[in-house]
Amino acid sequence: MALADLRREYTLNGLRRRDLDLDPIAQFNRWFEQAVTALQTEMIDVNAMTLATADKEGCPSARVVLLKGLDQRGFIFFTNYNSRKGHDLAENPRAALVFHWPALERQVCIAGDVTRLPSPEAEVYFNSRPRGSRLAAWASRQSEVIRDRAELEEKWLQLEKQFPSETIPKPPYWGGYILAPVRLEFWQGRPSRLHDRFRYTKQPDTSWLIERLSP
């Protein structure tokens, strides 16, 4: 089949202005809970999101990460500060997120400013991770070139001996980020590509302007 022939109709739901919460975080939570309920029997990471960053030269990169927290400060994720995304955010602390739930014919796009999560909060999350994941945070020099997989596995085995108990400290180069949204767009697929799109834009008084966009 030709790529040009790959298409589908979107028929599940519509989205009206009166359906929207005045607070975009509350609106996101509503959609997220619906996604969890609808997709809980499928092998899908509902909290998976594409994180787009750019370095100081404006060269973009993107990858899928997992949402690990959400409050009035914003969207929280964790990573190695020395990774490509960590370097990008150090040079250019703005980023975008995309959540795509195709089974619900929905997408949420978010843009905002990024800051590091306070270290005590990052430590609490780090200590909640499985032992293997905590060891992997030490074993991986994320985004650096390595000789082969055996090198990585050997390092992991060394760390198992170095940290024989459940107590494994958080690496100093590992932690969390908060993306504080300034713009969010909620997209609902509709028939004939007449999709519903609503954008929230943060105003100087911290209120949110809600506008319908053309598909």
Report each predicted region and the residues it spans.
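Binding-site signature for planar aromatic cofactors or substrates
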Residues: 1-215
